[in-house]
Regions:
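Glycine/proline-enriched, intrinsically flexible loops and inter-domain linkers
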Residues: 1-232
């Protein structure tokens, strides 16, 4: 019925057949999580292995630096919320021909060369600041990406299973918010990719793209490596 069904149908079928036995499931899962054995100084330990990807096609099309930066930042956020340390990433993007003259740019669009170079700068800026190794970078050039750019960031994280405490939320629970300061940037961004756009969207929708804060997320990554912090 939707793209999410296509993304999850394989795991559902494997689970139905009883083949997928190491899947970690709970009410809070925000990233694909599997149970693994990890060799730590010659001793097997129970760990959780987390995968997550995020697409920022629309934000990067509108504001390429911030869109690509928060693509990787948002992908990191989800395994991080599972108390894991994200240690590697992959970037796969799609664009039109960046060598075409700027004069051939479609009305209401940024030139492909601008999208390609500025998005690359945004992704690398965030990745370098947070200290994340991106082992695979691949950009696909095809006319089909002229109408809408493709921007995908994928990450892998891991954490000792003993660092994760599973509980269900209940009335009266105290909620602690962690992260950088927020402003009015990003308001409307969640629905921006689903609404109809006009020729002047490029001029008015840039504020819908949130501003990332890699140094703060870097601090959160380090905080959550401490068992006493992530088990609170």
């Amino acid at each position: 019925r939707c793209m999410m069904d296509l993304a999850t149908i394989g795991a559902k079928e494997l689970k139905k057949q009883g083949i997928l036995k190491n899947l970690d499931e709970s009410d809070e899962i925000n990233a694909c999580t599997v149970k693994i054995k990890c060799d730590v100084n010659g001793k097997d330990e129970d760990w959780l292995f987390l995968f997550k990807n995020e697409t920022h096609n629309h934000p990067t099309e509108i504001e390429p630096f911030g869109g690509a930066a928060t693509c990787i930042g948002g992908a990191i956020r989800d395994p991080l919320s599972g108390r894991s340390y994200v240690y590697q990433a992959m970037r796969v993007t799609g664009a039109g021909d960046p060598l075409k003259p700027v004069s051939e740019t479609l009305p209401g669009k940024l030139p492909q060369r601008k999208l390609v170079t500025t998005a690359a700068a945004g992704y690398s800026s965030y990745g370098n600041q947070i200290g994340l190794a991106t082992g695979q970078v691949d950009e696909i050039y095809h006319p089909g990406y002229v109408a809408k750019r493709m921007e995908i960031g994928a990450v892998v994280g891991a954490t000792p299973a003993s660092h994760v405490r599973r509980e269900c939320p209940a009335p009266g629970d105290v909620i602690v918010l962690l992260g950088g300061r927020t402003g009015r940037d990003g308001v409307g961004g969640a629905t921006g990719s689903s609404k109809a756009h006009k020729l002047d969207s490029l001029e008015h929708c840039g504020a819908e793209v949130q501003k990332g804060n890699a140094p703060i997320e870097r601090k959160l990554q380090r905080l959550f490596r401490r068992e006493d912090a992530c088990r609170m």
